[in-house]
Regions:
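Transmembrane beta-strands of outer-membrane beta-barrel pores
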Residues: 87-93, 112, 132-138, 166-170, ...
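Face-selective signature of the C-terminal outer-membrane beta-barrel domain
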Residues: 1-99, 104-140, 248
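Conserved C-terminal beta-signal and adjacent last beta-strands/turns
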Residues: 313, 329-431
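Gram-negative outer-membrane beta-barrel transporters
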Residues: 124, 247-260, 265-366, 427
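Repeated loop/turn-to-beta-strand initiation elements of outer-membrane beta-barrel proteins
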Residues: 75-81, 125-128, 157-160, 242-247, ...
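Membrane-embedded beta-barrel scaffold of Gram-negative outer-membrane proteins
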Residues: 1, 193-282
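Residues on the lipid-exposed face of transmembrane beta-strands in outer-membrane beta-barrel proteins
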Residues: 65-71, 114-120, 148-154, 234-238, ...
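Residues that define the transmembrane beta-barrel architecture of outer-membrane proteins
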Residues: 59-63, 108-112, 142-144, 228-232, ...
């Protein structure tokens, strides 16, 4: 192209003519778009694995139906009753770049569930709510999870709440089916099909930690299970000081069973024997941790109404998960978070103007992901908004910013930086 283009310019051709001639020469032998030759080359390029410079192709779909129905009209003499259910169909379609799905043959996963919730006021100071839910994933046994909550009215506008909850989580689509070569290691799912694909039955893998500490332990590719959680929560919400002060506080304790995390195992490239830590094949694999893992946290929020429609607010929360060494938990929640705010929804001569300012801070923590790990630094942002009402049309004009000072931060390892977002909005017939 360059030789023909420069030759054309030197012979007196205008730029467009020289470019057209050079393009004709350069495109000789180039397959036409949509031709069999083009499709063949396209398919070869898109199947190049990530370590060799290729990319990911993910055209997966999720189809779902959710519904609920309030039966209280028919059951109010006994209690308030709500029933509901859902159905989901996952179609994993990556042409073998992310999942082990053959070309044009997506991997299907079907889930469905149903629930019933019953709420009853036993007397003027006690309300009970109980619910039960059943869910089924085609790759796992069905799960039933009950919950019960009590709301105790201590006095007017002052309530305590107690709850006992059970929950579950089926392994995600990637935890089941991911199959990604990242050059330094392979990231795979927990589906049993990987046993034969990577010959773990004839060429076993070994825990990386066991090879490092000299106590060699074989990894047996255990059956993948849903993780379950049992939790208890206590809370209080009330209005104090002539209903100017609102306090909302809670604390919780949870106990995970079969917690899903990731570990590293190593397999010999020679096909047998104890693998070498530095030269043999490393896999990141999902496991269910056999011991209970505990989580706990608390939070408190305070809102106070000042004269002339001013208000101030603050909330602080903490979340903690006790993770054993060597287990990648992907908890990815900061231990501490803080929000402070001041606002006024109507001030000025006609009480049409308003504003809100919010300060947000988040503690730093060690981020764990399937593709990258690392220290995530703490960050803080300032959000602000001003508004003006137009009573005749029941409209509001708003001008505001999220991260007003444009302090760049990122909230996950590998994510792009987030800067300021500035906006203007107009709402019509809102009040």
């Amino acid at each position: 192209y360059i030789t023909t283009y420069l030759s054309g310019l030197m012979s007196g051709q205008v730029d467009s003519a020289a470019h057209a001639r050079a393009r004709i020469v350069a495109d000789q032998g180039r397959p036409a778009l949509g031709s069999p030759q083009f499709k063949d080359m396209y398919n070869k390029v898109r199947r190049i694995p990530v370590p060799k410079g290729g990319g990911l192709l993910d055209r997966s779909d999720l189809w779902g139906i959710d519904g609920s129905y309030n039966l209280s009209e028919y059951t109010k003499s006994f209690a308030d009753v709500i029933v509901g259910g859902n159905w989901r169909k996952y179609l994993l379609d990556s042409d073998s770049t992310l999942f082990p799905d053959p070309v044009d043959k997506p991997i299907g996963i079907t889930e469905f569930g149903a629930y019933v919730q019953i709420t009853k006021e036993l007397n003027s100071w006690l309300k009970l709510s109980a619910s039960g839910r059943y869910d089924k994933n085609e790759n796992f046994k069905g799960r039933f999870t009950p919950r019960i909550t009590a709301v105790i009215k201590a006095k007017e506008n002052n309530n305590f709440r107690l709850s006992y909850q059970t929950a579950y989580r089926f392994p995600s689509t990637q935890q089941q089916w991911i199959d990604l070569d990242l050059f330094s290691y392979k990231l795979i799912g927990g589906n049993k099909s990987f046993v034969s694909k990577y010959h773990f039955d004839t060429n076993p893998a070994y825990y990386r930690d066991s090879l490092q500490n000299g106590v060699v332990k074989q990894w047996d590719y255990p059956l993948q299970k849903p993780e379950s959680l049992t939790s208890f929560e206590v809370g209080y919400r009330g209005l104090l000081l002539d209903q100017k002060l609102m306090i909302d506080a809670y604390g919780y304790w949870g106990f995970y069973q079969d917690f899903t995390g990731r570990i590293s195992v190593i397999q010999s490239k020679s096909g047998s024997g104890i693998p070498d830590l530095n030269t043999d094949q490393v896999y990141s694999v999902p496991i269910n941790y056999h011991d209970n893992i505990n989580t706990n946290g608390f939070g408190i929020g305070v809102d106070y109404r000042l004269p002339r429609n001013f208000s101030v607010s603050a909330n602080f929360s903490s979340d903690n998960l006790d993770v054993p060494a060597g287990l990648t938990a992907n908890f990815n929640t900061p231990k501490y978070r803080l929000n402070l705010g001041v606002a006024n929804s109507s001030f000025g001569k006609d009480k049409r103007a308003g504003f809100a300012i919010n300060y947000r801070w988040q503690d730093g923590f060690y981020f764990e992901g399937d593709l990258a790990n690392g220290d995530l630094p703490a960050f803080q942002t300032l959000d602000a908004q001003v508004s003006y009402k137009f009573p005749k049309t029941k409209s509001i004009l708003k001008l505001g910013a999220t991260n007003l000072l444009n302090e760049y931060y990122y909230n996950a390892i590998g994510n792009s930086y987030v800067g300021g977002l500035y906006y203007i909005s107009f709402g019509y017939n809102l009040y």
